[in-house]
């Protein structure tokens, strides 16, 4: 989880120009990437939810209750889609403003990250080379044992496992040694990057350009504006949900009443 969060943080701070792996489009903005991820997630939830509703309505209990959940679900999905279309331009404007306000900080951090990357790359290459050598050495040691197993009888399996165990432990110990060495080599650069980030933030705090207080004030203003502009769309969503909820309530009460009558008649 920490690695995923760090990757996302670096991605947004550096304004990475990654492309879709299935397309050769122009580089996406951070907002476009966030919007695409959110759209895929919402659509997946909506589709899976509709499948569950359809399965319930097709069941014996669903047919007996006849709640018409699928119709209500489609109405709700349509309302949510409309809300997303209305809020889209508003959130786009908010993200554009935020991206503009942090442009200088992102550029400076991008330079710092690239410089640190160039410094640590030799250590990473050396680690990869040593790891490949260790794996190849392990493969060479294990190969004869595999031949013994193919040529020998089933009872030699236990003997083979006993021979493989120390080799696997040796590979693990040697790998741990290389990892510890790499961690020690990279530690100064990690500290350097952390100090640089702290220095950038301190410079902002002391007034080198826009101060952190100004950033906070601007972000608060933009969030307030976002709330004001999104309020009509949210009200439309509420109004759109009312008939859906009312229809569901009527269907549910009718189903309960029908079930009560059947129980009383027995």
Curated annotation (Swiss-Prot):
GO terms for molecular function: cholesterol transfer activity; phosphatidylcholine-sterol O-acyltransferase activator activity; phospholipid binding; protein homodimerization activity. Sequence repeats lie at residues 67-88, 89-110, 111-121, 122-143, 144-165, 166-187, 188-209, 210-231, 232-242, 243-266. Residues 67-266 are annotated as: 10 X approximate tandem repeats. Keywords: Cholesterol metabolism, Glycoprotein, HDL, Lipid metabolism, Lipid transport, Lipoprotein, Oxidation, Palmitate, Phosphoprotein, Repeat, Secreted, Signal, Steroid metabolism, Sterol metabolism, Transport. InterPro entries: ApoA_E, Apolipoprotein_A1/A4/E. GO terms for biological process: acylglycerol homeostasis; cholesterol efflux; cholesterol metabolic process; lipoprotein metabolic process; peptidyl-methionine modification; phospholipid efflux; positive regulation of cholesterol efflux; positive regulation of phagocytosis. Palmitoylated. Glycosylated. GO terms for cellular component: chylomicron; extracellular vesicle; high-density lipoprotein particle; low-density lipoprotein particle; very-low-density lipoprotein particle. Its main location: secreted. The modification Methionine sulfoxide is found at residue 109. Major protein of plasma HDL, also found in chylomicrons. Synthesized in the liver and small intestine. It holds the Pfam family Apolipoprotein. It is found in: Secreted. Residues 1-18 form the signal peptide. Participates in the reverse transport of cholesterol from tissues to the liver for excretion by promoting cholesterol efflux from tissues and by acting as a cofactor for the lecithin cholesterol acyltransferase (LCAT). As part of the SPAP complex, activates spermatozoa motility. Homodimer. Interacts with APOA1BP and CLU. Component of a sperm activating protein complex (SPAP), consisting of APOA1, an immunoglobulin heavy chain, an immunoglobulin light chain and albumin. Interacts with NDRG1. Interacts with SCGB3A2. Interacts with NAXE and YJEFN3. Belongs to the apolipoprotein A1/A4/E family. This is Apolipoprotein A-I. It comes from Canis lupus familiaris (Dog). The gene is APOA1.
């Amino acid at each position: 989880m920490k690695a995923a969060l760090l990757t996302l943080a670096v991605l947004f701070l550096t304004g990475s120009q990654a492309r879709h792996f299935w397309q050769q489009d122009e580089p996406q903005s951070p907002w476009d990437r966030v919007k695409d991820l959110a759209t895929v997630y919402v659509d997946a939830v909506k589709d899976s939810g509709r499948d569950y509703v359809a399965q319930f309505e097709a069941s014996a209990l669903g047919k007996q209750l006849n709640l018409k959940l699928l119709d209500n679900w489609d109405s709700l999905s349509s309302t949510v889609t409309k809300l997303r279309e209305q809020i889209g331009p508003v959130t786009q404007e908010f993200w554009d403003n935020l991206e503009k306000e942090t442009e200088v900080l992102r550029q400076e951090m991008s330079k710092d990250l690239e410089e640190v990357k160039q410094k640590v790359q030799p250590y990473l290459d050396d680690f990869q080379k040593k790891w490949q050598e260790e794996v190849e050495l392990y493969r060479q040691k294990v190969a004869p044992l595999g031949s013994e197993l193919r040529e020998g009888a089933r009872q030699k399996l236990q003997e083979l496992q006993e021979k493989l165990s120390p080799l696997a432990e040796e590979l693990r110990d040697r790998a741990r040694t290389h990892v510890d060495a790499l961690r020690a080599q990279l530690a100064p650069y990690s500290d350097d990057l952390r100090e640089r980030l702290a220095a950038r933030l301190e410079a902002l705090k002391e007034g080198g350009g826009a101060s952190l207080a100004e950033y906070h004030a601007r972000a608060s203003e933009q969030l307030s504006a976002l709330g004001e502009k999104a309020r009509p769309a949210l009200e439309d969503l509420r109004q759109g949900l009312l008939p859906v909820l009312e229809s569901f309530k009527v269907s549910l009460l009718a189903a309960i009443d029908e079930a009560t009558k059947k129980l009383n008649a027995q």
